[in-house]
Amino acid sequence: MSNTDASGEKRVTGTSERREQIIQRLRQQGSVQVNDLSALYGVSTVTIRNDLAFLEKQGIAVRAYGGALICDSTTPSVEPSVEDKSALNTAMKRSVAKAAVELIQPGHRVILDSGTTTFEIARLMRKHTDVIAMTNGMNVANALLEAEGVELLMTGGHLRRQSQSFYGDQAEQSLQNYHFDMLFLGVDAIDLERGVSTHNEDEARLNRRMCEVAERIIVVTDSSKFNRSSLHKIIDTQRIDMIIVDEGIPADSLEGLRKAGVEVILVGE
């Protein structure tokens, strides 16, 4: 009897083999989705979630709503694409974005960092008026094209296709003559002691520059990013003015943020 299926992939005969294949997919793709894996292996979504929970305990993956991402420390060279990130936590990102966009009032000058959560904020700004918005995200800028009442500024610079974001000296210099009311900052990892961090050095440098020219730093994220640390630090946790996050945030992280003087806005799905 053949040990391969119709696609030529080795047939999974047990839990260990299935988990090994999931690890391979994480390393190849950067992310996986529960429903896809359930259909692929012919097991329940509960079984797949248990697999992902096991991999998270092993430090291989970090769970998110709808799937999981590869840990940066496991495969530093793998970064999920914008498309992969967009497929995860979509409902939660939209809830976070809805809370964030309510903070933007006529006359405000805002920075929208690149990312999938800030993209959702941009989508909700279509009816805003008398707002100036600068971004380094190509997908964010495209979403703002339909917001006729928003004056759009781009940082320019070198384009990272993987994240659809601009970076570099030109991007950093474009910020130096501006002062903004608020920055909406998307992040890859948050740790109370190690601060806010990301996997890309160039983006971390640009993010630090954004923080310098913004009156308020507002982090928009989901709870899966907590108790994680990526290679390149952006800022200390204490520098965050506000964080908008889902109710799944770990209790110790929530307590620590509030003790640090960070205003926390909790949202449901």
UniProtKB/Swiss-Prot annotation:
Name of encoding gene: agaR
DNA-binding region: 32-51
Domain of life: Bacteria
Residue ranges of domain HTH deoR-type in the record: 15-70
GO biological process entries: regulation of DNA-templated transcription
Function of the protein: Probable repressor for the aga operon for N-acetyl galactosamine transport and metabolism.
TM ranges: none
Transcription recorded as keyword: yes
Keyword Transferase (UniProt): no
Entry-linked Pfam families: DeoRC, HTH_DeoR
Originating species: Escherichia coli (strain K12)
UniProt name for this protein: Putative aga operon transcriptional repressor
Keywords tagged on the record: DNA-binding, Repressor, Transcription, Transcription regulation
Alphabetical list of InterPro entries matching this protein: AgaR-like (IPR047779), Carb_Metab_HTH_regulators (IPR050313), DeoR-like_C (IPR014036), DeoR_HTH (IPR001034), NagB/RpiA_transferase-like (IPR037171), Tscrpt_reg_HTH_DeoR_CS (IPR018356), WH-like_DNA-bd_sf (IPR036388), WH_DNA-bd_sf (IPR036390)
Molecular functions per Gene Ontology: cis-regulatory region sequence-specific DNA binding; DNA binding; ligand-modulated transcription factor activity
